[in-house]
Each structure stands twice: as C-alpha cells, then as structure tokens.
A protein has these predicted regions:
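C-terminal nucleotide
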Residues: 99-252
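Gly/Ser-rich oxyanion-binding loop with an adjacent helix/lid
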Residues: 1-118, 245-252
Length: 252
C-alpha cells in the first residue's frame, strides 16, 4: 500500500501524504486470484477518495490510478506485472468480460472493451477455485516468460508477438504460417512460448465471437484449449490446478 502512495506522489500528486490503513479481504493470498492487485487498487481508490484527487469515478481517471498500482508492484515490491490484474480489478463491469488489448500503440481508453458475459442465460455458473497452490509474482517466472517472448520478437524482426499473431491470422493457411514462424526459432522452449502467445490471441478472438453468437460449446472448447496451452507450452500451471481442471472436465 505504501508503494501506491509513493507512485502517486511520483506522478505529481503531492497532496497524498502519510496514512494509517487496515485491510480485510476475502481474496486468498498467493492463489493466483489477483490478491495483490486487489490490495493496490483498493489502496489507490481509497487515497483518491481521502485526498480528493477525483480520478476514481471515471474509467479515464481510473487508468491513472491503475498506473500507480502497477508502478508500486513493479518498482517497489519487485513483483513484475503487465497490468492485466489491475485493469480487471478497476475496469470490469457487472455481467461483462473485459477484453484487454495490450498493444503499446493503443491509448488506455482504446485498449479495453466490455463483452457481454451473461452465463445465467445459458444455465451456467463461473466457478472460481482456490487450489491451495502457492503463487508469487516476485519469483521471476513472469519476467522470464516476458523476456523470452521479447527475445523471440527481436529474432523475428517485429516489435512484439502481436504483430506476428495478426499476420498469421490473416494468412491463407494459419497453421502453415505458424509452423514457418516457429521454424525460424532455434530454442525449443522459445518455440513453445511463442506458440502459446500466438494461439492464445487467436483463441481470445474466437471466444468473443463464439460467446456473442451463443456457441457455448465452442466457447468451452476454447477454454479447455487455453488451459492445455498454458500447461504444455507456457508451462505456468501446477499439478493442483491441472487436477482441478481434470476433475471439472470429468464431471461435465
């Protein structure tokens, strides 16, 4: 929390001073459910309210608070984060899924859209599980994955892997185009990371279309494929999570 106050002052909000705070949360710590973002974002909103900054009431204003929350985690806590959790915590709306586009050329007001996500209409519920598997942002795994992807983009001669993903999606034969892209990389681990990023972008776009058109079975298939890719190619799952997914699949 003190990191958020520091980040706001670094951004020029000198009205922010010292404060006493007590936190109570139902989000399990270290469970991969964005507990750190919940804390930093709630702190940012509290400081915005206490010191009358006037940024918490609008989406545009919340972007400023999000940036402070991200900076506090990256620069003070040493927990690398790209901003997904903070944007979800601050910008989601009830009954919708937040579609976040992280292309650097987009402004913060251009990079999100709200996608209707009414599960009740289909008799479904979103189940959130705490697998009890420990998770830490400062263990270096996030930074390692990001560095690998940035190195791959450098080898491929593009600014980021989104450029490659968009090019492949527009090709006449995306599968062949993906193979040709991966063939340009020598490191097997790098190939897996890139394959996940490119196919995950495609899955997100396909999921949005499927859900919008009421194709729930297709949306579910994409969810399953996403987990498989996270497990096999991006290697960020753990046995506890894989077991939970296997049990869920076995029970329909």
């Amino acid at each position: 929390p003190v990191g958020v106050a520091w980040a706001l002052r670094e951004a020029g909000f000198n009205a922010v001073q010292g404060f006493d705070a007590a936190f109570s949360s139902c989000v399990p710590l270290g469970s991969g459910l964005s507990s750190s973002a919940a804390m930093t974002c709630s702190t940012a909103l509290a400081l915005d309210d206490v010191y009358g900054l006037g940024y918490g009431a609008s989406d545009a204003g919340r972007v400023t608070l999000i940036n402070a929350a991200i900076k506090s985690e990256n620069d003070m806590a040493g927990a690398s984060t790209g901003g997904l959790d903070q944007n979800a915590s601050m910008r989601c709306t009830f009954g919708h899924a937040l579609r976040l586009d992280c292309r650097p050329e987009l402004s913060p007001l251009e990079n999100v859209s709200q996608q209707e996500f009414d599960l009740d209409k289909y008799g479904l519920e979103l189940l959130v599980l705490d697998t009890q598997a420990p998770h830490q942002l400062n263990d270096g795994q996030y930074a390692q994955r990001r560095a690998t992807c940035e190195k791959a983009a450098e080898i491929l001669g593009v600014a980021n892997l989104r450029v490659v993903a968009d090019s492949i999606a527009k090709s006449d034969d995306p599968f062949q185009a993906l193979k040709e892209t991966l063939d340009k990389l020598e490191d097997d681990t790098m190939k897996k990371r890139v394959r996940h990023v490119i196919t995950e972008i495609a899955r997100v776009n396909s999921f949005v279309r499927a859900f919008a058109n009421g194709k729930i079975d297709e949306a579910g298939r994409l969810f399953n494929a996403s987990h498989d890719s996270l497990s096999a190619d991006y290697e960020v799952t753990v046995p506890e999570l894989d077991t939970a997914v296997a049990v869920a699949r076995a029970n329909g």
